[in-house]
Amino acid sequence: IAKKFDHNIIETLPALVPLTFSEKILEMCKELSGLSVEAIVSFNKVLFQEGMLFTHRGLSGPSILQISSYWKQGDNIKVNLSPKLNVYKLLEEKRKLNPRLDILNIVSEILPKRLAQIICSENKVSGNISELSNKILKQLSENINAWLINPTGSEGYRTAEVTLGGVDTKELSSK
């Protein structure tokens, strides 16, 4: 009908939809399925600080659903798994105060234990914090405060809560 009145039609896309990932990240998500964390999820200058849920299909939860409306195929999103904390500063402080602390125990104070175990394993860190270089601590903290991930897609219209696009509302009047 809108085309008959010469209205511009914007391509429709699924929005407010869970994101899917490559096999490596998907395996991690499956291991953490059901775990929810408070996170900041961002794409370009758009960010949302809300819950993020690991599922057997990828990532979901309010922050992921929101960012899915802005994310473009092929681009990375950034996830801050500990938005209230500068993890690198905390790790430096812990190392100064008690160099014998186990890195997994420290990360488990910041994140749920299952997530902490996977992050430490993925970063190949274990043992006393005093044994870890600044470079390793910085890399570990970046994977917590600025985890860059590249979704392979979304779950599509099947699970989308809304649709982007359609009739260009700039061409409509409420009068």
Question: Where are each of the predicted segments found?
Answer:
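An anion/pyrophosphate-binding glycine-rich loop and adjacent beta-alpha core
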Residues: 8-13, 17-134
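A glycine-rich dinucleotide-binding beta-alpha-beta segment and adjacent secondary-structure elements
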Residues: 117-175
